[in-house]
């Protein structure tokens, strides 16, 4: 069955049929196609555009098709051009001529615009739910590690001491912003294109407010040409997914570094690691590496759709069919990565002693030594130079700042006194950082309370 062909005098070339067909991938939103058709048929009946008895017959027929697909009784086959053709043909086969009235006042242009919007709307919600679960794991790790010291890095060099709670809090903030972007996308996209027709609406007295309400939208879209050609919501969602994947990729890179023999900050669970076919000793962070690798795949979907849309005149063009495969793949890839990442960090173990020892080395307390001098009246720029001399002395002797004698301190600056050792201890360096957003346990607990409230309210 074709939904068109009356003005054609030749059969379509088989290669053209195969090239044009989309059922191999758009069958993914069979449920949304049925939901949209049920709403449309219900509205047609209430408006008196078709008899209510036939509207009810169509609705029941569509519900039966949905039940049979989901039970496995009915298989979607690729002999049809697209999911819309399959649905209409199956409906007519089951209920007869009444099924031929379903497409009254509707085009495949607004039908597919609706289906994709319904499908994407649910994917936005699904992704948001996955992110929230990941954030719950991050928050649990934060609560358990407010006093677990580790080095903080800049330029991948040790900089200042922080805690695991503080480090993981940075990712909590990233994913919080990601969720905010998803919520914004939902607000903008949640308007119904059904009733836009091919591009110029229809002469039938459709009740677009009713169909929008039945489908859970805030209301109908306001321009029929934009309605059938808008893919902004998809571009926005793919952009948000790309940002999520970028955050996961950064996190994955750190997991790979921390898991290396040179760092040994963490131990990944066996269930989330793999081995080598030749090297018996290997325990590889493949999940983190694959998440990092799949980031480019999601980026590619975004760039592909932007490129597809950049030269398309109003309104609908067949180019837009290319939005589906790449979007479906990106949706599944991002959700899968979030879910696996959650399991990986939920089961990994921290090597607290190793991290603390690493935090004590590398002069992470040098800034605190400079601050010590500032509090005793030395201008910061002078203090910076003094501590730089001390660091050079330590490097030459292969010792830490803590290992210098008081005489060695005083030889560089007489301002130093016995209390320098307490001032540059790891505990003090972290505990004294009490500005909001810093790693000090006291302020960290306040931030955790804020995050708890966020998780309850969002």
From Swiss-Prot:
It holds the Pfam family ASL_C2. GO terms for biological process: arginine biosynthetic process via ornithine; L-arginine biosynthetic process. It catalyses: 2-(N(omega)-L-arginino)succinate = fumarate + L-arginine. Pathway: Amino-acid biosynthesis; L-arginine biosynthesis; L-arginine from L-ornithine and carbamoyl phosphate: step 3/3. Its main location: cytoplasm. Its EC number is 4.3.2.1. Keywords: Amino-acid biosynthesis, Arginine biosynthesis, Cytoplasm, Lyase. Signal peptide: none annotated. One of its GO terms (molecular function) is argininosuccinate lyase activity. The keyword Cytoplasm applies. It is found in: Cytoplasm. Transmembrane segments: none annotated. It comes from the Bacteria. The keyword Cell membrane does not apply. One of its GO terms (cellular component) is cytosol. HAMAP family: Arg_succ_lyase. Belongs to the lyase 1 family. Argininosuccinate lyase subfamily. PANTHER family: ARGININOSUCCINATE LYASE. This is Argininosuccinate lyase.
């Amino acid at each position: 069955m074709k939904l068109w062909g009356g003005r054609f005098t030749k059969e379509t070339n088989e290669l053209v049929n195969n090239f044009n067909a989309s059922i191999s991938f758009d069958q993914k939103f069979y449920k949304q196609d049925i939901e949209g058709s049920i709403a449309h048929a219900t509205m047609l009946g209430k408006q008196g555009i078709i008899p209510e008895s036939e509207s009810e017959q169509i609705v029941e027929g569509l519900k039966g098709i949905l039940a049979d697909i989901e039970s496995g009784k009915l298989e979607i086959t690729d002999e049809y051009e697209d999911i819309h053709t399959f649905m209409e043909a199956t409906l007519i086969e089951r209920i007869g001529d009444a099924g031929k009235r379903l497409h009254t006042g509707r085009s495949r242009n607004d039908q597919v615009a609706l289906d994709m919007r319904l499908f994407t709307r649910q994917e936005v919600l699904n992704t948001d739910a996955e992110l929230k679960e990941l954030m719950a794991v991050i928050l649990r790790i934060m609560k358990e590690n407010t006093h677990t010291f580790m080095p903080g890095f800049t330029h991948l060099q040790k900089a200042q001491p922080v805690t695991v709670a503080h480090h993981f809090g940075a990712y909590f903030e990233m994913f919080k912003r990601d969720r905010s972007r998803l919520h914004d996308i939902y607000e903008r996209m949640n308007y119904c294109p059904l009733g836009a027709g091919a591009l110029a609406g229809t002469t039938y007295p459709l009740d677009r407010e009713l169909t929008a309400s039945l489908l859970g939208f805030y209301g109908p879209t306001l321009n029929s040409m934009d309605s059938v050609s808008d893919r902004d919501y998809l571009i926005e969602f793919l952009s948000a997914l790309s940002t999520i994947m970028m955050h996961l990729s950064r996190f994955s890179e750190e997991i790979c570094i921390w898991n290396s023999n040179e760092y040994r900050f963490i131990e990944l669970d066996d269930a989330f690691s793999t081995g080598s076919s030749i090297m018996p000793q290997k325990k590889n962070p493949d999940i983190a590496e694959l998440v990092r690798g799949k980031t480019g795949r999601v980026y590619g979907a975004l760039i592909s759709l932007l490129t597809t849309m950049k030269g398309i005149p109003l309104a609908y063009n067949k180019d837009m069919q290319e939005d589906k495969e790449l979007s479906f793949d990106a949706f599944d890839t991002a959700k899968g990565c979030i879910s696996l990442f959650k399991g990986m960090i939920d089961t990994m173990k921290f090597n607290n002693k190793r991290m603390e020892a690493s935090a004590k080395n590398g002069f992470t307390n040098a800034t605190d030594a400079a601050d010590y001098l500032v509090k005793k009246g030395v201008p910061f720029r002078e203090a910076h130079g003094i501590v730089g001399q001390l660091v050079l002395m330590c490097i030459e002797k292969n010792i830490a700042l803590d290992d210098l004698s008081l005489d060695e301190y005083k030889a560089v600056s007489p301002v130093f006194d016995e209390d320098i050792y307490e001032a540059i201890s790891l505990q003090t360096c972290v505990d004294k950082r009490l500005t909001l957003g810093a790693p000090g346990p006291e302020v960290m607990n306040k931030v955790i309370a804020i995050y708890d409230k966020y998780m309850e309210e969002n």
